[in-house]
């Protein structure tokens, strides 16, 4: 059993063979590109797998959704990874850095993902239809993210921000957020902003 498969089972993250194959291929692509382009700090498959599990863990509690906008996708965390896991949902990946955009396009092609659109822009310069879910990982403060995402938010839009332990200082309890802890991560979720 592969290390990734073992972790998916350990953390009760749903997967099938196609998802596992794509995640393993993504890991190889990221490590290959990372040597030349420094896309992320992950230097080996174990470190990439940590990012994969971090990206996928919310599948344990997220309600179903049809569309997602991921702000600051970077090398694919969490948007591209969630797109691999949820092929029936559409993902708009928003990333302004050209080398990361090139990598994302390459991954979409190599992995045969038809549910992904990549936007090589900053969120402030983008016009999109309001998605069901907005995600972001390690981009900026919660209030700044909400301000940047405001044009994309409709009454049906939920948010999932991948935050660190300091998230409690960024929000008020009465704002209706659910915080789910996992290792050093705090998943900040609010259904129907």
UniProtKB/Swiss-Prot annotation:
It is found in: Cytoplasm. It is an enzyme of class 2 (transferase). GO terms for molecular function: rRNA (guanine-N7-)-methyltransferase activity. GO terms for cellular component: cytosol. Keywords: Cytoplasm, Methyltransferase, rRNA processing, S-adenosyl-L-methionine, Transferase. It catalyses: guanosine(527) in 16S rRNA + S-adenosyl-L-methionine = N(7)-methylguanosine(527) in 16S rRNA + S-adenosyl-L-homocysteine. It holds the Pfam family GidB. Specifically methylates the N7 position of guanine in position 527 of 16S rRNA. Belongs to the methyltransferase superfamily. RNA methyltransferase RsmG family. This is Ribosomal RNA small subunit methyltransferase G. It comes from Wolinella succinogenes (strain ATCC 29543 / DSM 1740 / CCUG 13145 / JCM 31913 / LMG 7466 / NCTC 11488 / FDC 602W). The gene is rsmG.
